[in-house]
């Protein structure tokens, strides 16, 4: 379902969003359930077994149907998901063209990914399964499965399976019961 966000839809969304945020005060499970329903209602494709999405994450509301999130995905604080980009307008103006424009692109995050705080995910990005995207990273393009990405622009600094095995052997983490 393609819902373009006119002013009325934005007002409705903001009112519903206030309710979702307040639900976090009652229960984390209730918050996640309501948030998933809200995002799905506006066209985002989101797995039934959603992980965690921090309330401060920003999803480009130009067209939610351009965003797909898999199972067990963690989205940390202040992550930006941008599905459109108007930079081409400045490029066209600089080259003497009198027309504007914008780029649109889908964003897909496959299963079992961790997106760190203040990551920016740009249009036309596909993040494969089991990836870790480090805090502050700017991501664009295809990210291979099991990659650990860091920086601006994002670069692969390791692989999640090797990283997980190393920390499992060192036992330097706190296990979740």
Question: Where is each model-derived feature located?
Answer:
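Terminal amphipathic alpha-helical/low-complexity segments used for targeting or macromolecular assembly
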Residues: 1-44, 72, 85-90, 152-177
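Short flexible/disordered coil segments
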Residues: 8-11, 107, 112-119, 140-141, ...
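Short, conserved clusters of charged catalytic residues that mark active-site
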Residues: 30, 34, 116, 134
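N-terminal segments that cap or nucleate solenoid repeat domains
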Residues: 38-55, 59
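Flexible, glycine/small-residue-enriched loop-and-beta-strand segment within the central core
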Residues: 54-126, 152-153, 159-161, 166
């Amino acid at each position: 379902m393609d819902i373009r966000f006119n002013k009325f839809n934005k007002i409705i969304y903001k009112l519903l969003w206030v309710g979702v945020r307040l639900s976090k005060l009652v229960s984390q499970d209730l918050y996640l359930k309501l948030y998933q329903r809200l995002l799905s209602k506006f066209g985002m494709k989101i797995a039934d077994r959603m992980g965690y999405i921090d309330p401060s994450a920003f999803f480009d509301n130009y067209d939610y149907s351009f965003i797909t999130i898999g199972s067990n995905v963690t989205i940390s604080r202040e992550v930006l998901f941008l599905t459109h980009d108007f930079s081409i307008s400045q490029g066209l103006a600089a080259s003497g063209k009198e027309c504007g424009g914008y780029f649109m692109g889908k964003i897909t995050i496959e299963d079992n990914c961790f997106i760190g705080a203040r990551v920016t995910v740009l249009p036309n990005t596909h993040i494969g399964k089991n990836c870790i995207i480090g805090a502050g990273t700017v991501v664009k393009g295809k990210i291979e499965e099991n990659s650990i990405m860091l920086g601006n622009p994002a670069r692969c600094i390791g692989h999640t399976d090797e990283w997980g095995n190393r920390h499992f052997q060192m036992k330097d983490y706190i296990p979740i019961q």
